[in-house]
């Protein structure tokens, strides 16, 4: 992996054997090895239900449905995380590009990337997140 060196210690320490048992092969590859699921194949790409999207590894709430939008990119897209504490950003120099990788700030799981082509009337950001890195918890609209 040609991501910048990660010396950060995350609060939630993952046991690899336990993760391999608990996660699907795709969830494991995405969250632990920064793989990317194929566009338009993820479980949450078109989900419009009200609720919270949580880290599949540690269950930290990451995004709310109100921040989700249809970007047409093939992955769930959000214009902001739940708050400024839940996301960790790292420079990613893979595939001949320089991008900003997005990780769960509690466990370090790879989630996806953030780009500056989101809705201009919101934050201008597009958090492009792999469905395999998320679990969805449905909630009524008024909660």
From Swiss-Prot:
PROSITE patterns found in the cross-reference section: MSRB
Record: active site: 128 (nucleophile)
BP terms from Gene Ontology: protein repair; response to oxidative stress
Keywords in alphabetical order: Metal-binding, Oxidoreductase, Zinc
Pfam families, per the entry: SelR
Listed EC numbers: 1.8.4.12
KW Oxidoreductase (keyword) present: yes
Molecular-function GO term, any one: zinc ion binding
Binding site for Zn(2+): 55, 58, 104, 107
One CC-aspect GO term: cytoplasm
Cofactor(s) the protein requires to work: Zn(2+)
Signal peptide: none
Catalysis performed (reactions): L-methionyl-[protein] + [thioredoxin]-disulfide + H2O = L-methionyl-(R)-S-oxide-[protein] + [thioredoxin]-dithiol
Top-rank EC class of the record's enzyme: oxidoreductase
InterPro entries recorded: Met_Sox_Rdtase_MsrB (IPR028427), Met_Sox_Rdtase_MsrB_dom (IPR002579), Mss4-like_sf (IPR011057)
Comment on bound cofactor: Binds 1 zinc ion per subunit. The zinc ion is important for the structural integrity of the protein.
Residue intervals of the MsrB domain: 16-139
Superkingdom field: Bacteria
NCBIfam families assigned to the protein according to its UniProt record, in alphabetical order: peptide-methionine (R)-S-oxide reductase MsrB
HAMAP family for the chain: MsrB
The family this protein is said to belong to: Belongs to the MsrB Met sulfoxide reductase family.
UniProt name for this protein: Peptide methionine sulfoxide reductase MsrB
Organism: Burkholderia ambifaria (strain ATCC BAA-244 / DSM 16087 / CCUG 44356 / LMG 19182 / AMMD) (Burkholderia cepacia (strain AMMD))
């Amino acid at each position: 992996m040609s991501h910048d060196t990660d010396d950060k210690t995350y609060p939630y320490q993952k046991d690899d054997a336990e993760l391999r048992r608990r996660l699907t092969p795709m969830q494991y590859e995405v969250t632990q090895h920064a793989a990317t699921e194929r566009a338009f194949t993820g479980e949450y790409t078109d989900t419009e239900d009200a609720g919270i999207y949580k880290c599949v590894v540690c269950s930290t709430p990451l995004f709310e449905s109100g921040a989700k939008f249809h970007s047409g990119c093939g992955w769930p897209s959000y214009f902001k995380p739940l708050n400024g504490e839940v996301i960790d950003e790292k420079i990613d120099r893979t595939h001949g590009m320089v991008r900003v990788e997005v990780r769960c700030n509690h466990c370090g799981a790879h989630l996806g990337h953030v780009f500056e082509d989101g809705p201009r009337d919101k934050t201008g950001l597009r958090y492009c997140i792999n469905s395999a890195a998320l679990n969805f918890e449905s909630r009524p609209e008024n909660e």
